[in-house]
């Protein structure tokens, strides 16, 4: 399994880091077999798995439950788990308690925290406590209400400078890696030069040290539409629906199960069940 130092070396050597989300055992198993470098158990599971309207309703217990499943499916892959909405904002004590629960109970290798202002101290506290932290700046879904919707961040000079400053502060606070979401490609390239930690992009251009996408977006499963920055490599929903429809049809028409799908009983035993008749 790759470690924090391996990811730094990959950045130094110019080798792209591949991160993908996963939320259960089979997804994680396939991701590891495909050769991803890191798996993110994102709070995006609220929308793509649990059917919620946003990530806000996801709990610490949800993250622990899904990370456990992912860990079983990808024992040799570095796993990052999101700290969900308001689990690291109330107090330092609550932050450490929630983080410890996720790490100890789920087996995650690192935790991801969204935001800059108000979060630097949490990054520092977790790092000092021995928990690796991945920072997330730009479009931060947990704060989408404050940001005014799902919009590209850092498009004007003031907000661009703020993103650069916050990226540097995240590293100074101890973050091992930085995720930039929906940020102009040129700004991503600038931030990449300003920090020594790997920068992972999602809708942040090709100059980042690596990329992350949501599993369901990549394979075309359960999503009605995908963001501009997504490249969809398959559309498995059609295949799945066809298989399920075939099953329904065969049962209704009594085509399934066939004899080869059934178990047989010895005729003598069968006669005994009917009173020897």
Swiss-Prot record:
Catalytic activity reported: 3-methyl-2-oxobutanoate + (6R)-5,10-methylene-5,6,7,8-tetrahydrofolate + H2O = 2-dehydropantoate + (6S)-5,6,7,8-tetrahydrofolate
Active site: 181 (proton acceptor)
The EC number(s) this enzyme carries: 2.1.2.11
Any one Gene Ontology BP term: pantothenate biosynthetic process
Keywords: Cytoplasm, Magnesium, Metal-binding, Pantothenate biosynthesis, Transferase
Top-level EC class as recorded in UniProt: transferase
Name the record gives this protein: 3-methyl-2-oxobutanoate hydroxymethyltransferase
Molecular function GO terms recorded: 3-methyl-2-oxobutanoate hydroxymethyltransferase activity; magnesium ion binding
Localization per record: Cytoplasm
Annotated metabolic or biological route of this protein: Cofactor biosynthesis; (R)-pantothenate biosynthesis; (R)-pantoate from 3-methyl-2-oxobutanoate: step 1/2
InterPro entries associated with the record: Pantoate_hydroxy_MeTrfase (IPR003700), Pyrv/PenolPyrv_kinase-like_dom (IPR015813), Pyrv_kinase-like_dom_sf (IPR040442)
Annotated TM spans: none
Major localization class: cytoplasm
Positions that bind 3-methyl-2-oxobutanoate: 43-44, 82, 112
Purpose of the protein: Catalyzes the reversible reaction in which hydroxymethyl group from 5,10-methylenetetrahydrofolate is transferred onto alpha-ketoisovalerate to form ketopantoate.
The organism of origin for this protein: Bacillus velezensis (strain DSM 23117 / BGSC 10A6 / LMG 26770 / FZB42)
Source domain of life: Bacteria
Subunit field text: Homodecamer; pentamer of dimers.
SUPFAM superfamilies the UniProt entry points to: Phosphoenolpyruvate/pyruvate domain
UniProt-annotated binding residues for Mg(2+): 43, 82, 114
Cofactor annotation: Mg(2+)
